[in-house]
Amino acid sequence: MASATRLIQRLRNWASGHDLQGKLQLRYQEISKRTQPPPKLPVGPSHKLSNNYYCTRDGRRESVPPSIIMSSQKALVSGKPAESSAVAATEKKAVTPAPPIKRWELSSDQPYL
């Protein structure tokens, strides 16, 4: 591999003001350091760095259905029919995707068909 002579290296170092050959592998200053400081996490379910099991730091376990604070509709008590409804409860038939199939009638003039 070609390199400059010692005289040329010293001349370059003197002109630049620092040693250009000292750390060639770390020539970029924006590279992150190998030892990182510990993270500064906000206080929450995962603020502990150790003894923090996945099931306790999973945010989905903390979610609950919304609580109804106020409603304009009156809720029915389970097991009791509504007192104000005058219409008797009728059972609803199952919904079919098409009109009911008509039953075919056999012709009376040709009984073998």
Curated annotation (Swiss-Prot):
Q: Where is this region: Disordered?
A: 32-51
**Record's InterPro entries?**
NDUA7 (IPR009947)
Positions where Phosphothreonine occurs in the chain: T96
Q: Note one Pfam family from the annotation.
A: CI-B14_5a
Q: Could you cite one Gene Ontology molecular function of this protein?
A: NADH dehydrogenase (ubiquinone) activity
**Which cysteines in this chain are paired by disulphide bridges?**
none
Q: Where in the cell is it found?
A: Mitochondrion inner membrane
For membrane topology, the record states: Peripheral membrane protein
In Gene Ontology terms, what is a biological process of this protein?
A: proton motive force-driven mitochondrial ATP synthesis
Principal localization reads mitochondrion
What is said about its interaction partners and assembly?
Answer: Complex I is composed of 45 different subunits.
According to its UniProt record, which protein family does this protein belong to? Answer: Belongs to the complex I NDUFA7 subunit family.
Q: Which PANTHER family match?
A: NADH DEHYDROGENASE [UBIQUINONE] 1 ALPHA SUBCOMPLEX SUBUNIT 7, NADH-UBIQUINONE OXIDOREDUCTASE SUBUNIT B
Q: What is this protein called?
A: NADH dehydrogenase [ubiquinone] 1 alpha subcomplex subunit 7
Per the UniProt record, the source organism is Homo sapiens
Q: Which gene encodes it?
A: NDUFA7
